[in-house]
Amino acid sequence: MSEQEGKNEKKVTEGQWTTGLYDCLSEDISTCCFTWVCPCVAFGRIAEILDKGETSRGLAGLMVVAMSSIGCGWYYASKYRAKLRHQYALPEAPCADGAIHCFCCPCALTQEHRELKHRGLDPSLGWNIENGGLNSNTPPFVASGMDR
């Protein structure tokens, strides 16, 4: 196990967040800075993982930008936080998902990124890479014909 893997290991307890909402500066400063500077890209990465590759990170990022332009980006992002919570049976804490994304979106995105990473899914790698390229364009295996 590499030193980096050891750093990312965190005891995962079902039904509990592995880190707090405001742990962004104490644990993963690079992700924290990234979500403050490029929240739409950070959101796109998280959405791609939560949608299991069905939604591309680019499309999700553009959707949150479009929704933000009419003041509803926080609502769109909060739906993905709810999806993450339901997937891992996490509590809606410290307050409602919408309120967290409305008032502290970068902290919410950083926490969601850390949560996925601690559970073995790194949003920065993307869905196909993380899952061994399951959706890559590999030609199907064709059995050879019968020989006489």
Swiss-Prot record:
It is a single-pass membrane protein. InterPro entries: PLAC_motif_containing. GO terms for cellular component: membrane. Disulfide bonds: none annotated. Keywords: Membrane, Transmembrane, Transmembrane helix. It is found in: Membrane. The keyword Membrane applies. The chain crosses the membrane at residues 59-78. May be involved in cadmium resistance. NCBIfam families: A_thal_Cys_rich (TIGR01571). Belongs to the cornifelin family. PANTHER family: DUF614 FAMILY PROTEIN-RELATED. This is Protein PLANT CADMIUM RESISTANCE 9. It comes from Arabidopsis thaliana. The lineage of its organism: Eukaryota, Viridiplantae, Streptophyta, Embryophyta, Tracheophyta. The gene is PCR9.
